[in-house]
């Protein structure tokens, strides 16, 4: 049975969805003020695999990734480039969708945009005001975290500990340093009318509102990068409790950072690897192998040496599938069976907190096993199992498949060897080698 590490309880727990076979999963997506870097894509690649595996277990997964298309960073970048905020956001939404397609991340059911839910956010905030969980300052409307008894439970800190790191200096009228903005009063950039004053919603409120609009609570899985644990997910939990007196999610899953040069990969630090640039050098499958070769709760320190290792793994898998498939074809052998031992191991690894890194090791071990046998039935089962596992990882390897002419070339090569026509045999052998068949 599947066990998942729950960030809320800080332990692995058996995964029991609220309404099986339905599973509701919400993952925080990008703020579209620039292209996505490699660190941004790590959660997207991982949760794509999560959905694929849950569907393999015969669950029906409704998977939502939101798009933050109104934000101070968008406004700042739009002003800098002298374009409209929405035009800038649309440009990077298109870039985001193109990247998902290139990386074969096609399992997302819906990508709501924050600007589509402004009216719902206004109603949501008014409810918080009516219930005493929010208050006004000259700068906007804030959430009163002191009214949430267990605020800080995701971060495992109480209010006194959180107070030390909070930023009261941004608004001296805040009742508590950790109170966060629900509706920002501003005239800069795009603003929206409200019953109170023109402004725009706070980021934490955008997600909390969209989740309640799209799902029956609690979510089965709420995911994102580890940097979202606090304050973003903590503040979503607080708002949901205050607004609807419900639990936001049964499981919180957080994907660790992807660093570069031993620092967090960040646009603000300028130490970023843009995915669009990396894809000019590497096949998308290699990027996915890099990401999935480390457990999602362990950080990755990106280097081009790691990329080369992932490329070598990709090449080993490609070479095996090409040669093995050719061997089965020339022997006119085909079956749909899977290797039960391999699949049992695969499920054991995935059901222990989705250990994709060990699954990739399993694939490499399977290829080594295959090199030690010529039994057609076994080789076919190895290949079928590998292809199924690769599909769950969202990796499609376009290995060479022989045509009738290629098969004829093989038999002509065998005849040339048999009749000791070595010159012709060398020519035919080279043709097969060039295509990776032998």
UniProtKB/Swiss-Prot annotation:
A motif ('HIGH' region) lies at residues 30-40. The keyword Transmembrane helix does not apply. GO terms for biological process: cysteinyl-tRNA aminoacylation. The gene is cysS. Its EC number is 6.1.1.16. Binds 1 zinc ion per subunit. ATP binds at residue 267. InterPro entries: Cys-tRNA-ligase, Cys-tRNA/MSH_ligase, Rossmann-like_a/b/a_fold, tRNA-synt_1_cat_dom, tRNAsynth_Ia_anticodon-bd. It comes from Onion yellows phytoplasma (strain OY-M). Keywords: Aminoacyl-tRNA synthetase, ATP-binding, Cytoplasm, Ligase, Metal-binding, Nucleotide-binding, Protein biosynthesis, Zinc. Belongs to the class-I aminoacyl-tRNA synthetase family. A motif ('KMSKS' region) lies at residues 264-268. Disulfide bonds: none annotated. It is found in: Cytoplasm. Zn(2+) binds at residues 28, 207, 232, 236. The keyword ATP-binding applies. GO terms for molecular function: ATP binding; cysteine-tRNA ligase activity; zinc ion binding. Gene3D superfamilies: Cysteine-tRNA ligase, C-terminal anti-codon recognition domain, HUPs. GO terms for cellular component: cytosol. Its cofactor is Zn(2+). This is Cysteine--tRNA ligase. It catalyses: tRNA(Cys) + L-cysteine + ATP = L-cysteinyl-tRNA(Cys) + AMP + diphosphate. Monomer.
